[in-house]
Amino acid sequence: MRVAHFIAAVLLAATARADLVPIPAGVYRPLFLGENDPKEIPVRAFSIAAAPVTNGEFLDFVRANPKWRRSQVKRLFADDGYLRHWAGDTELGTRCDARQPVTWVSWFAAKAYAAWKGGRLPTTAEWEMVAGAGFTTADGAREPEFVKEVARWYATPAPETLPAAGTGRANVFGVRDLHGLVWEWTGDFNSAIVTGDARGDTGLERQLFCGAGSVGAKDTANFPAFMRFGFRSSLQAAYTVHNLGFRVAKDP
């Protein structure tokens, strides 16, 4: 029985990784608004991978594109931590599994992979709209079970050994692992701070990192979104992080 369950989980993960899930048009409601900013941003229909890119999938990419191998990538495009958990340029080794989500990848590398697959990185609006969907409806904030589960995910430290991508519970669209597995790059990850230098904009810094302090108890479902925005605001495109991966999106 255990073997059967294991095989079923592996097949489920493989199917989820391979699938692009169609997402209908909708709206994204930004957390941080300027005086003249719209309260809602229209999001056109698109498709997004059901699960993050795995080590095995990224290995295929670097084998086909030598300039993105660990020893050959330019430091302009990835810092010293790039693919540090792999055993070599084209060898995963024993520290990671082919089915786990790839991490230690820069925004430049993630963008190149997505283009290689004929797609792109999802925009922040797209990613957040899909991530806001619950298990049974497109508005997860209205699902107590979903809100509780997401809060638990963000309060729990990441495991030392990541599980296989694509094994988390799917949301109403059929997308998995948006919460509780790894952080994910978006195509415009730094869009919240491009209007100024965050190092000198203390007001913006307070808004990004302390904004949750102004949210009442009824809005606790927003805390994970504040965490994501705070994390994104700290990134630069060449950065690599041990729990930062990505997934691919495509236009219709």
Where are these regions (language model features)?
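Sec-dependent signal peptide recognition
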Residues: 2-9
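Hydrophobic h-region of N-terminal signal peptides that target proteins for export
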Residues: 9-17
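Disulfide-stabilized, aromatic/cysteine-rich ligand-recognition loop
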Residues: 18, 100-101, 105-107, 119, ...
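Mature N-terminal segment immediately following signal peptide/propeptide cleavage
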Residues: 20-27
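Short, polar loop/linker segments at the starts of domains and inter-domain junctions
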Residues: 30-45, 221-232
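Cytochrome P450 core scaffold surrounding the K-helix E-X-X-R motif
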Residues: 30-34, 189-197
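Active-site microenvironments of metalloenzymes and redox enzymes
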Residues: 42-146, 250-252
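Short, well-ordered junction/capping motifs at the entry into regular secondary structure
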Residues: 151-179
